[in-house]
């Protein structure tokens, strides 16, 4: 309690910022792999949706190939391509950074397909589409039938509903006998796939 009152550092604001960061981390995971409200009180994540999203299987076990990425992109209807992007684990991203074009000739022959961003805050590109990462997503090599990469127009395919803005209440009285101050943080959000045709999922064979 004394630290909150006497410190030159605004510890109260530090606590608030810590809660907000914790909310962001939890939501990032839940919108990707959340298991639903019925049992777990979580949103249904993009990679957990049990029906509706068309899946594209890797051609074979082992390394992801250029053909796998082409199949994933070509499987998405053209009306969603303009705003499409990739979403994957960082380890999968690292593997894709090593992909080169194949074939005997052509502009992509033996050229890296990955386009690193040269502007701070802008995403890297793969085959002309932005790439975003989320470490909650299964990574390539985690096992058969694992969903390892999503591609599509996420704004149209997945809806996030903010049911209640974050509220953080300082509890001055509850722990007063112990010389402590408590904080109660509450935030209610949900999310789910609303337009599965706008999304495609790459899965392990």
Q: Model-found features: residue ranges?
A:
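Alpha-helical scaffold segments that mediate packing/assembly in large oligomeric complexes
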Residues: 1-75, 103, 108, 201-205
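Flexible loop/turn segments at secondary-structure boundaries
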Residues: 5-6, 38-39, 92-97, 138-141, ...
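Sequence/fold signature of self-assembling virion shell proteins
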Residues: 9-22, 63, 102-205
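A beta-strand-loop signature enriched in Asp, Gly, Thr, and Trp
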Residues: 51-131
